[in-house]
């Protein structure tokens, strides 16, 4: 759980990564209605356990996805320290299988299925 005293969510790389992933594909024709919540996202990152192994990307695909995210953040400019931290969180989410093939966060149902399997 995140302490709210002196906490500026707009400067939290985890929150910024969560927002980027949670809104990916919003408004397009996809079956995913909503992603996991921020607290659950943080829990999964902290546990560092693979959530859905079949979502793990090959190194080549992961690098391509991360390059796409980098271009979105920088628009071809320099990568700030904050951007770099956000990309590290996004990379970890990919490596833990928390992001599907459409680059969107898993839905609650997928997380619950994982939770019930352990």
UniProtKB/Swiss-Prot annotation:
This is SPbeta prophage-derived uncharacterized protein YolB. It comes from Bacillus subtilis (strain 168). The lineage of its organism: Bacteria, Bacillati, Bacillota, Bacilli, Bacillales. The gene is yolB.
């Amino acid at each position: 759980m995140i302490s709210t005293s002196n906490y500026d969510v707009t400067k939290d790389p985890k929150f910024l990564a969560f927002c980027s992933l949670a809104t990916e594909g919003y408004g397009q024709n996809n079956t995913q209605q909503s992603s996991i919540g921020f607290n659950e996202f943080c829990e999964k990152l902290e546990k560092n356990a693979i959530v859905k192994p079949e979502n793990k990307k090959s190194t080549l695909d992961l690098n391509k996805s991360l390059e796409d995210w980098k271009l979105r953040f920088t628009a071809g400019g320099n990568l700030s320290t904050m951007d770099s931290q956000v990309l590290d969180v996004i990379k970890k989410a990919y490596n833990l299988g928390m992001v599907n093939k459409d680059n969107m966060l898993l839905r609650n149902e997928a997380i619950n299925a994982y939770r019930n399997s352990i």
